[in-house]
Amino acid sequence: MLSSIKSAAKGTVIYGFANVSIKLIGIILIPIYTNYTYLSKEDFGVLGVMDITYQLTIIVFGLSLYQSLARWYLDPEHKSSQKSMHFTVVIINMAICAVSFLFVYLFSPQISELLFSSDKFSRLIWIMFASSSVNIVSSVSMMLLRLQEKAIKYAVISITKLIVTLGVTILFVVFWHRNVQGVYEAMLIGEIAGLILISADIFRNSILKFEYKKLLQMLNYGLPLMLASVSSVLLNTFDRYSLNYLSDLDTVGTYTLAFRIANTIKVVVISSIQLSLIPIIFRKMGDPDHKRFIAKSMNYSALLVMLVILFLSLFSLEIVKVFASNVSYWEAASIIPLLSFSMIFIMMKENVLIGLQITKNSFIMGLLIAFTALFNLGLNMLLIPRYLLYGAAASTLISQMVMFILFYFISQRKYVIPYELKNLLLLIIAGIGLYCLSLVSGHWPLLPRLLFKLLLIVLLPMLLIPLKFYEPIELQRIKEFIVKYKKMIFK
């Protein structure tokens, strides 16, 4: 058990580093995006809408085939056809993206009119789609690197994409003043660089054989996953689409800043945990302790995520001031805690999904997420006209909570896993309590306020000891870890 957790932790660090490298672009460039010299607040709102459309495009036109490939690739029954399955998925993705790009290119003015009530973003639309198409093709082989546990190579390619994309973005936006279009031109160049780097693995892991029957099986498994993924993306993006239609692009710009900061929890921490854990969980399916491993991984993943949630929530104003010098953006700090706390339910939902993935109940997953997405849309329609930013953030938090509850009960009916719900509830209550306690320091001088907030974050793991969050053996291992590294530091 402990060796599996250590293996997952090691993978989390490496994949986390790779994920950080990719997502750092969105964080590093915030001071540029929020500087009126380069992008207006309306431009940043356009970027926010384009970002979520980019995510949706990848999900829809990728058909979740890379996820299906992962499920079939690890199955011993299909070991002899791994390369032909990989070839099949790559070819199908390339064909779909090529045909779809032609359609988007021809109808980009109409798509721009639909999104922004103007056709002036038509060029931006097809550049964005070209970038997402390259991402769809390369993501299949990037998934293969994960399945083959080539974490270092995965990280190297990801970091190279970061450097290329970051450098070209700065060149296009800061020096050539190409506005939002320059952002996606740079993204396209970065994706092409990543595809070139992974191309050797594409050829190495392919043989010229089209697996028609297996493709149908993967589509049968993957299409419900695509529905789930589309619904999930809509669930996470209806807030900005709704703000775009019910408010204005300036409001979308403020919300986008808050969401980008809060969403670092998902794209860096939660995604890294999932990238590392999922292959280990599927390999351990035959082990007698695999259910306990899943439950324990939930506990410690939740603790890690809650620590980051507290950091972003307690220091939201300071973080916003660092990234955005324009005072008009500072209101974003007030909704970061709501968006951040929604991430704990996203993380737990991803974990309980495992039961449905193991039993291949992808259709149920799609239905549940679709229902929650519609519920979220209804909440947005109800709350945004009256509460604007706060309504959108509250809608996100409530919807993620509802989705976790639905997935937990349905998943447990299909595949029972002994999750420690009491410990998870105590963790969430402790996190909320510490955040509320931090509010008393709102008018303190800067240094005492910062120190007090840091103390509250450090207190969280210790507060869980009397609440019996840890088992005795876990406390013993923690003590041994502290003693070991204390000796190394003071040697």
Residue ranges of model-derived segments:
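Hydrophobic alpha-helical transmembrane segments
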Residues: 122, 126, 155-203, 221, ...
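Helix-loop junctions and terminal segments of transmembrane helices
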Residues: 61-78, 147, 258, 262-302, ...
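Signature of the first transmembrane helix
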Residues: 4-67, 92-105, 162-166, 170, ...
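N-terminal membrane topogenesis motif
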Residues: 1-28, 80-88, 212-228, 472-491
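Membrane-proximal transmembrane or re-entrant/amphipathic helices at the cytosolic face
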Residues: 440-491
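Membrane-interface junctions at transmembrane-helix termini in multi-pass inner-membrane proteins
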Residues: 134-157, 202, 206, 337-371
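Interhelical loop/hinge segments that connect adjacent transmembrane helices in multipass membrane
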Residues: 1-8, 180-182, 186, 196-236, ...
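Interfacial segments at transmembrane-helix termini and the short loops linking adjacent helices
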Residues: 108-128, 312-344
